[in-house]
Amino acid sequence: MDTKTLIASEIAKVVPELEQDAIFNLLETPKNSDMGDLAFPAFSLAKVLRKAPQMIASELAEQIDESQFEKVVAVGPYINFFLDKAKISSQVLEQVITAGSDYAQQDEGQGRNVAIDMSSPNIAKPFSIGHLRSTVIGDSLAHIFAKMGYQPVKINHLGDWGKQFGMLIVAYKKWGDEAAVQAHPIDELLKLYVRINAEAETDPTVDEEAREWFRKLEDGDKEATELWQWFRDESLLEFNRLYDQLHVTFDSYNGEAFYNDKMDEVLELLEAKNLLVESKGAQVVNLEKYGIEHPALIKKSDGATLYITRDLAAALYRKRTYDFAKSVYVVGNEQAAHFKQLKAVLQEMGYDWSDDMTHVAFGLVTKGGAKLSTRKGNVILLEPTVAEAINRAASQIEAKNPNLADKEAVAHAVGVGAIKFYDLKTDRMNGYDFDLETMVSFEGETGPYVQYAHARIQSILRKADFTPSATTTYSLADAESWEIIKLIQDFPRIIKRTSDNFEPSIMAKFAINLAQSFNKYYAHTRILDDNSERDNRLALCYATATVLKEALRLLGVDAPNEM
């Protein structure tokens, strides 16, 4: 139990008028440590108990069991709690040393499934930095949910259907070179895609021709289907090579095309429930009672189904297949209206499990302040960017540690980790400007900074030849050790907050705080001095490294033992 929860539970025993959660939220950290570690303001009880806050604080301080604390004192309207630092540090260190990487493992999920719709790049288009956010946020959440006791199911809902394939077929038939596409599939397909879009801006017949080819594809035309399958196969080979570099795996690659034969059932269900309304020849579902002004367009006047119809089919399939406890869609914030409609239509259909669906939205990545666009050819391609990040990491490692063994593997861990960490430390609803130099820096709030703190601790433990014993009692009470102990003790709560808020930046910021606290401790403490505190300090180092490594793992970032 963390100290805040402990204090809240002790206060709740003597204040039945307040729920423990309410007490927890009222606890404050005094600005001056001389006033204790945590304080409870009694103002909120004044009306209920009809007494002055000062009197309430004084009376309650007398009633609270002090055995868990160094002391409990009333100061004005506050009850100040002084924690027994030696006792708590001993408990925390024992927990980490005993559990190792399983420290803070939780059982909220009880093995239930969480479906995570993530990454989902478009076939025949390059994997750009724009897709990175969905990929790394989804991957981190998968690790977090597993730590909370859920079974994550990572779904790559590939963009392998739609009018863009009509455009691409038109472009390929006009200008395509089979040998060139086979040699460099994504590069060639991107050139064709950008060129046909540029032509479509001045020639309206291009759109008509593309729509016709896409209709042929929907009808199973042999030539259209063969071209589509070829574009898909070549793109997937390229994507999987990139996923390997990012150390990201998936449980399903069922994309948009997978649901082609599953949409009729959606239409039948909507018709059976009398939810479809005709509007200008199209079929829609009105959602005004959910506060959604625009109806959900299910089927166009030409008979073509839409994105939402496909997502309804996917939601039904996933519930039947995985019986998920949660279903999350890691998709850009520009799709917010779509996901509101999706949930509302499912609610209208009578599916209560739609409450378990969450749109995990995120902001845009820009470059030099400009929005990225595949159609206009303004993209940052991931593959060369990852290669450059690895090279930058390798240069810094060479300068810091020229004799390091396995330099290539470490440079890969640092370069890829730098890109992932920078993305994840940004509150997901915020965008960020892509700047590789800042990302790969060993200074500042970066992945390499946190990785280097972990590697530094491993170096100390190697020099000391220290392995902690689960049967030995380790204890520390100095101020800088205490800052680290408090963070380590808070790790289970950080994991839960990250999970509850679908917000990996909470975990990334925790990792930065822990690395900074350790570096401050390292600068002011002679850890390896042969005195009575040596083993206690080394046990703290061991626990810090264990939690840092696990925090990075939960972000999908490796923690090298040497850098």
Swiss-Prot record:
Annotated CDD domains: Anticodon_Ia_Arg, ArgRS_core
EC identifiers of the protein: 6.1.1.19
Motif ('HIGH' region): 121-131
Catalytic activity: tRNA(Arg) + L-arginine + ATP = L-arginyl-tRNA(Arg) + AMP + diphosphate
Keyword set, alphabetical order: Aminoacyl-tRNA synthetase, ATP-binding, Cytoplasm, Ligase, Nucleotide-binding, Protein biosynthesis
GO biological process: arginyl-tRNA aminoacylation
Keyword Ligase listed: yes
Pfam families from the UniProt entry: Arg_tRNA_synt_N, DALR_1, tRNA-synt_1d
Signal peptide interval: none
Main location (coarse class): cytoplasm
Location within or outside the cell: Cytoplasm
Molecular function per GO: arginine-tRNA ligase activity; ATP binding
GO cellular component, one term: cytoplasm
Top-rank taxon, per record: Bacteria
Protein family per UniProt: Belongs to the class-I aminoacyl-tRNA synthetase family.
Subunit record text: Monomer.
Protein name (Swiss-Prot/TrEMBL): Arginine--tRNA ligase
Native species: Streptococcus pyogenes serotype M4 (strain MGAS10750)
Gene name, Swiss-Prot/TrEMBL: argS
